[in-house]
Regions:
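N-terminal glycine-/serine-/threonine-rich phosphate-binding loop
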Residues: 1-40
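Short hydrophobic alpha-helix segments
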Residues: 122, 128-129, 271
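Cysteine/selenocysteine-centered motifs that mediate thiol-based redox chemistry or coordinate metal-sulfur cofactors
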Residues: 151-183, 187-189, 288-356
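Cys-nucleophile CN-hydrolase/nitrilase-fold catalytic domain and related Cys-dependent amidase chemistry
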Residues: 19, 31-122, 191-223, 227-228
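Active-site-proximal beta-strand elements of phosphoester/diester hydrolases
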Residues: 4-16, 115, 128-130, 152, ...
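Short beta-strand scaffold segments in enzyme catalytic cores
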Residues: 98-100, 114-118, 151, 258-260, ...
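CN hydrolase (nitrilase-like) catalytic-core segments centered on the catalytic cysteine
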Residues: 75-97, 159, 168-279, 346-350, ...
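A short, polar/charged loop-to-alpha-helix boundary motif
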Residues: 131-145, 275-294
């Protein structure tokens, strides 16, 4: 990575359930960060068009109505919508990592995915990361990512990657991201919460009422940074109370909480709550070198002779055309001679049987 690079965390509220207006707000935020000379800007989980805080809504018919609206306001990659975002990153000369709900690019599908879209400073789409396993009630909203979503991107500022929310608690995924050479990590979340005894008991964090240390985000991100020796830009969604639909009140956790840490888990910017802001920090590659001198997860502190990680599987495709078995030409010649037929005739027979 570069010896010094300025990065930014965009704690800005989406225009809830309005794709076009939220894209417009994203472009204005990208422009502002570009003027501040940031080279990487990270938005919150599902910034476009907002997190589905209605995910557990009853009755199911009302949930279904929300789901259809969510589909209509989700992002297709690529599309004219991503072109608008790409133009903004090109003009601002920065890389953007944008949390979004993505609608499937598979013909005939309306499935949604919890995605981070990465766009380069040249306006080209670097790629995407789809959340591998939606959490709890999220499985009623989003599909699952696959092996193609375990990836990093080599850029002029360094090797960047990102994962979503509770993926930061997936030990093997963290190890995979480190093994892929990630240097700068983009972490996205739906908010900041107080957790009472277990993950199923959450409420929105209120700075004047609660201790932020009850939220697992802070510990997960600082440990991710230390374990992988990466810089982490962590962005949690913020939606003001007065803009949160009443239907979503039971799962209103959108308190913000963006922060930035170095590879030792030390704050470069501490968490900020309940307001829109862009946090900036200068990343110093020497922080990473110092940490790796003490604890290098891919070098002198690794024991690959004892413990190794395997990436398995292939990208999921609905249609797979079976490849025909190819016989070795010398084997065909021997078989033709054995049965007294021409090689060309044997090839035709095998082809008709579908095995040649």
């Amino acid at each position: 990575m570069l010896d010094k690079v300025k990065v930014a965390a965009a704690q800005v509220a989406p225009v809830f359930m309005n794709k076009e207006a939220t894209i417009d707000k994203a472009c204005k935020t990208i422009e502002e960060a570009g003027k501040a000379e940031a080279k990487l800007l990270v938005f919150s989980e599902t910034f476009i068009p907002g997190y589905p805080y209605w995910r557990g809504l009853q009755p199911i018919s009302k949930w279904s109505d929300y789901m259809v609206e969510y589909q209509k306001n989700s992002l297709k990659i690529p599309s004219s919508d991503t072109e608008i975002l790409a133009d903004a990153t090109r003009e601002a000369n920065l890389i953007a990592a944008i949390g979004c709900t993505e609608i499937s690019d598979l013909k005939g599908s309306e499935t949604l995915y919890n995605t981070i879209l990465f766009i380069g400073n040249d306006g080209e789409i670097l790629g995407r990361h789809r959340k591998l396993m939606p959490t709890h009630g999220e499985r009623m909203v989003w599909g699952m990512g696959d092996i193609s979503d375990v990836r990093v991107f080599d850029t002029e500022i360094g090797t960047i990657g990102g994962v979503v929310c509770y993926e930061h608690h997936m030990t093997l995924l963290k190890a995979a991201m480190a093994a892929l050479g990630e240097e700068i990590h983009c972490a996205v979340w739906p908010g900041w919460w107080v957790m009472k005894r277990h993950p199923g008991a959450k409420k929105r964090y209120r700075p004047n009422e609660d201790s932020q240390h009850f939220c697992d985000i802070e510990h997960a991100i600082r440990e991710y940074a230390f374990e992988t020796q990466t810089f982490v830009i962590s962005v949690s969604q913020y939606v003001p109370d007065d803009l949160m639909p009443e239907d979503c009140a039971d799962f209103n956790i959108a308190a913000g909480g963006a922060f930035i840490v170095n590879p030792a888990g030390v704050y470069l910017q501490e968490p900020v709550f309940d307001r829109e802001t862009i946090l900036y920090a200068e990343l110093d590659a020497d922080d990473r070198r110092h940490t790796k001198a003490y604890f290098d997860a891919l070098g002198h502190y690794a024991r690959f002779d004892v413990l190794r990680l395997e990436l398995r599987g292939e990208p999921l495709e609905p249609l797979i055309k079976s490849a025909k078995f190819k016989f070795d030409p010398s084997m065909l010649k021997l078989l033709a001679e054995k049965y007294g037929i021409r090689v060309e005739k044997l090839e035709k027979i095998l082809d008709e049987l579908g095995i040649g």
